[in-house]
């Protein structure tokens, strides 16, 4: 029997429910911070690339500060790094932090937002296919059903046919966003098996901050914009307050919760649950910004929720392998 299947079983049982809750909390954190990012971008105080740089760099500062403080206090022994660990973190930071955000911002600049979102969330399919075909981890029918429902829900919710147009570079960027998002889950899944979640996320953000600093020098950042105001929920709100939510909730908390979920859930299941982000963003925008949800958005949200419920129920149930009948995960610990 395949070692990878043991890993999947161990992730699902007996803590699959915990993984589901962590993945849902991560999606809520990502989605809830969306309207705050939108307010900053709409105000014109920061460009999309500068916003990405600020959130990643400040998140790195916060998390690396915690890592250093914990090591100095002796609360956690220093991890013995290997060359493989270093390359994994470099890949995670470059793809999971930088590529997905930069490519998405380029995509929405050249494509309708619905089309760009559809591109990005095709990562749900990419992760499931990669796990099944290249990693030889056959996925249960419930996961494939969840993937199908999640993608269908995203299509209905984003209405990509509205104002439809295609751009070559926009499509390339959209594909890059999908690959970056898939890498976030696949590399994160491997990383959580090798490194503590906090260190993986903190050093990954650090790599992302360095990569962006090479392209966008920090000394050219428009720091004066932090003292300006942007319209949020009908009021003038300091940009630094909006960005604080984006950094602490939409980046630090969201990434840490997402990586923690991957310690208990296989990446294909986690990606399906992650599609809740777009629904949460729409609901928060409706509740806070007064943006009305259309019938299509509500219907798409229901479809996404159905897919999440299917996958969550699968994670709750004990793992069933083709060769064995109701195998206990504690008996599947890799040697």
Residue ranges of model-derived segments:
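Glycine-/small-residue-enriched transmembrane alpha-helix faces in small-molecule transporters
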Residues: 1-53, 163-190, 211, 323-335
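Specific transmembrane alpha-helical segments of multi-pass solute transporters/efflux pumps
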Residues: 29, 70-116, 120, 156, ...
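Hydrophobic alpha-helical transmembrane segments of multi-pass integral membrane proteins
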Residues: 17-22, 50-69, 91, 146-149, ...
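Membrane-interface helix-cap regions at the ends of transmembrane helices
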Residues: 5-11, 59-81, 149-165, 208-238, ...
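Juxtamembrane C-cap of transmembrane helices in multi-pass membrane transport proteins
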Residues: 29-46, 51-52, 58, 101-111, ...
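Specific alpha-helical transmembrane segments that line the substrate/conduction pathway
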Residues: 50-61, 104-138, 177, 267-286
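Hydrophobic transmembrane alpha-helices of multi-pass small-molecule transport proteins
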Residues: 63, 129-130, 139-159, 178-181, ...
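C-terminal-most transmembrane helix of multi-pass membrane proteins
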Residues: 2-9, 56, 159, 239-241, ...
């Amino acid at each position: 029997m395949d070692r990878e299947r043991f890993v999947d079983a161990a992730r699902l049982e007996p803590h699959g429910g915990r993984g589901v809750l962590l993945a849902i909390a991560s999606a809520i954190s990502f989605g809830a911070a969306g309207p705050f990012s939108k307010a900053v971008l709409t105000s014109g105080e920061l460009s999309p690339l500068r916003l990405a740089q600020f959130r990643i760099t400040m998140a790195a500062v916060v998390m690396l500060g915690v890592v250093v403080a914990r090591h100095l206090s002796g609360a956690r022994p220093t991890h013995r790094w290997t060359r493989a660990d270093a390359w994994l973190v470099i890949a995670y930071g470059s793809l999971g932090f930088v590529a997905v955000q930069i490519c998405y911002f380029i995509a929405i600049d050249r494509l309708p937002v619905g089309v760009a979102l559809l591109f990005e969330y095709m990562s749900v399919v990419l992760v499931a296919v990669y796990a099944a075909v290249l990693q030889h981890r056959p996925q249960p029918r419930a996961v494939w059903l969840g993937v199908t429902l999640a993608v269908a829900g995203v299509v209905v919710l984003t209405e990509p046919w509205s104002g439809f147009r295609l751009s070559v570079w926009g499509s390339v960027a959209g594909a890059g966003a999908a690959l970056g998002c898939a890498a976030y889950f696949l590399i994160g899944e491997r990383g959580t098996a090798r490194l503590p979640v906090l260190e993986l996320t903190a050093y990954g953000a650090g790599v992302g901050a360095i990569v962006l600093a090479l392209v966008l020098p920090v000394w050219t950042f428009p720091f004066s914009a932090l003292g300006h105001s942007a319209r949020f929920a009908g009021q003038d709100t300091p940009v630094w307050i909006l960005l604080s939510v984006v950094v602490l909730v939409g980046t630090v908390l969201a990434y840490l919760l997402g990586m923690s979920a991957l310690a208990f859930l296989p990446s294909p299941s986690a990606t399906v649950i992650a599609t809740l982000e777009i629904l949460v963003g729409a609901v928060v925008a409706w509740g806070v910004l007064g943006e009305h949800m259309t019938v299509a958005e509500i219907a798409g949200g229901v479809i996404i929720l159905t897919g999440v419920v299917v996958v969550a129920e699968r994670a709750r149930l004990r793992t069933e392998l083709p060769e064995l009948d109701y195998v206990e995960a504690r008996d599947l610990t890799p040697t």
